């Protein structure tokens, strides 16, 4: 059972951007 790379990647990129935006 592999998680959706697209969904995980998108969420990861958004979270990463938000983290570095603070």
UniProtKB/Swiss-Prot annotation:
GO MF annotation, one: L-malate dehydrogenase (NAD+) activity
Entry keywords, A to Z: NAD, Oxidoreductase, Tricarboxylic acid cycle
E.C. no: 1.1.1.37
Keyword NAD: yes
Any one of the GO BP annotations: tricarboxylic acid cycle
Reaction catalysis annotation: (S)-malate + NAD(+) = oxaloacetate + NADH + H(+)
Binding-site list for NAD(+): 9-15
Name of the protein described by the UniProt record: Malate dehydrogenase
Protein purpose: Catalyzes the reversible oxidation of malate to oxaloacetate.
């Amino acid at each position: 059972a592999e998680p959706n790379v697209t969904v995980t990647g998108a969420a990861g990129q958004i979270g990463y951007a938000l983290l570095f935006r603070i």
